[in-house]
Amino acid sequence: MATQADLMELDMAMEPDRKAAVSHWQQQSYLDSGIHSGATTTAPSLSGKGNPEEEDVDTSQVLYEWEQGFSQSFTQEQVADIDGQYAMTRAQRVRAAMFPETLDEGMQIPSTQFDAAHPTNVQRLAEPSQMLKHAVVNLINYQDDAELATRAIPELTKLLNDEDQVVVNKAAVMVHQLSKKEASRHAIMRSPQMVSAIVRTMQNTNDVETARCTAGTLHNLSHHREGLLAIFKSGGIPALVKMLGSPVDSVLFYAITTLHNLLLHQEGAKMAVRLAGGLQKMVALLNKTNVKFLAITTDCLQILAYGNQESKLIILASGGPQALVNIMRTYTYEKLLWTTSRVLKVLSVCSSNKPAIVEAGGMQALGPHLTDPSQRLVQNCLWTLRNLSDAATKQEGMEGLLGTLVQLLGSDDINVVTCAAGILSNLTCNNYKNKMMVCQVGGIEALVRTVLRAGDREDITEPAICALRHLTSRHQEAEMAQNAVRLHYGLPVVVKLLHPPSHWPLIKATVGLIRNLALCPANHAPLREQGAIPRLVQLLVRAHQDTQRRTSMGGTQQQFVEGVRMEEIVEGCTGALHILARDVHNRIVIRGLNTIPLFVQLLYSPIENIQRVAAGVLCELAQDKEAAEAIEAEGATAPLTELLHSRNEGVATYAAAVLFRMSEDKPQDYKKRLSVELTSSLFRTEPMAWNETADLGLDIGAQGEALGYRQDDPSYRSFHSGGYGQDALGMDPMMEHEMGGHHPGADYPVDGLPDLGHAQDLMDGLPPGDSNQLAWFDTDL
């Protein structure tokens, strides 16, 4: 029978090597596990054929395929000869597949495998055998290692505590070797006495090799939770922190990586590291040059500083901000830059660390990384820059950063756009150089496009609108910026933001932007056509009613709604209407909305800024005779006369101007009395002004200039409004620093004023306007 012949052939091939096979297994510390007794057994053939490798195929087809696979042709006799060779070496092929270690070196066995991607049947059958063999080997090795370690640990513990340092060194080396194998490593970590001895030896030794071996052992143990707990309970953290002062790089590496594993996975490790002085030691290591070592060290600092103010202050006191900024400026290793930017991000929300990072050049060091291909690095740098930017408005050398931020506004990543808009908003605050730079690199167009794309995402639209508000005021390119918003189709979307679902912070910023846009006469008609005036009046009425309701209920403190005071909305809307009222058609619309009674009522406001803008808008409306009569009919003369005595020069000036225009049709006696009243009120603190007025030269028609408002005025106050929201890591919000009120322009025409004696000299004698006082509309620090 063919199958029996095959089995006999296999048995004859295996017989001579049977003892060698058994011997080989015994040399590997194995006993005979049944391989010898089962050497001559095999499963019967399922096909019943003599040669299990043969297939029932057509011979001619085989010959055809054979010829296709070789460049030379074979005769029938040659094919039979080759087939015979394969039959004679069948046993060797089986042995090579299942027990390759039993073959003699150099033995050549013809292979039946023609395609490396398709193993033969014998090779496939041999795979489970090989897997079983390796499993048995691993199991026996593991058992041997565990038994050896268990027997050796008590003795090694004694040797580690020996007084002879040579003995201690040898024991440390042996323990280190044992810790490299998993079984013995588990045995070590389960012995508190051994772990304590390792920690004590590492801490007390003066021998470099002993320190290296003990630190290496703890490093190996720290890859297991059980090992981390054993190190923690044995007081390993203070010892490892001490090793951070070692001059040996390998010891430093073992110590910092072990501490890193503890900080990541062991409860209580953070506090232990802080108490042991680990923060100071880690900051001191930031001057090293090994980038991988620095990456681990900075990650440790991030873990320790996150959510812990005391740690942030310790890092600051240790010189951390400067060292971290130097790393960002010096290295290119992505992981190091990423871990360092994470530390800076955590520190950037600390009010003490923030200015230190900025002064160390943090803005300039982080900026170049915004074009890095690593998105995680870019995102961390953006968050950090966003948090730092409100403290960096006075920084120089920001041109490159500003250009990059404008480019990033076109990103498809919402987080990138959000951060870029926020940073631009803060950096353009009260910095005319930054404003001009952003305008010159296409910032207006980019910001308008950003607002258009953002839709109702206020975390993007609010900072973008704030940035536009800054860019349209108080710098040489401001008029160009005011025009550019219109030319890039921004007016419709800006006016739309005054409507729901916009929240009060966004509405406040939009009102300020509209006020600035109205400084450009070319924007008057488009803003009117977009319905800006009725909506501003609606917002004004609503905010005023809210303040009146609160006052009637006995409230004394100003109320915040979504972080915005309603008094700010009253002031902002009135100021925007004041500038829009420079256009005659806009004045008609404003008067037609029955706003004059409200403006007159605002003259009684206890807030000087509201008094000023109310008087300002009445001043513009009073240019029209009908409006002047309506103002007088509402009883405005009394409050305006009272405001002539205001300590705020802007309020007094506007009140005087309204009274001028209201007196146009009055008798001459009335005009003379008014002239005397104005003279005594406006020049009460300057008795010699009448003789000096010719040289003072107030330019009443200067667009956007403020009227007589000095910084030492008690009404010149600052406040903070909330930023654009906090991030998921507890980031502090960006602070938008703003002044309490803006300062209305004074470019109303004076040609039509009646002759009031010295009236023109009176107007010329006022202090010149300060163009840097438009505070409500451009955030001031």
Curated annotation (Swiss-Prot):
Phosphoserine PTM sites in chain numbering? S23, S29, S33, S37, S45, S191, S246, S552, S675
- Residue positions of the PTM N-acetylalanine? A2
Tell me which domain of life the UniProt entry assigns to the organism this sequence originates from.
Eukaryota
Record's GO cellular component terms? adherens junction; apical junction complex; apical part of cell; apical plasma membrane; apicolateral plasma membrane; basolateral plasma membrane; beta-catenin destruction complex; beta-catenin-ICAT complex
Q: Which residues carry this modification: Phosphotyrosine?
A: Y64, Y142, Y331, Y333
Stretches for region Interaction with VCL: 2-23
* Protein keywords: Acetylation, Activator, Cell adhesion, Cell junction, Cell membrane, Cell projection, Cytoplasm, Cytoskeleton, Glycoprotein, Membrane, Neurogenesis, Nucleus, Phosphoprotein, Repeat, S-nitrosylation, Synapse, Transcription, Transcription regulation, Ubl conjugation
**Gene Ontology MF term list:** alpha-catenin binding; cadherin binding; chromatin binding; delta-catenin binding; disordered domain specific binding; DNA-binding transcription factor binding; enzyme binding; histone methyltransferase binding
Region described as Interaction with BCL9: 156-178
Protein name, UniProt field? Catenin beta-1
- Its gene name is Ctnnb1
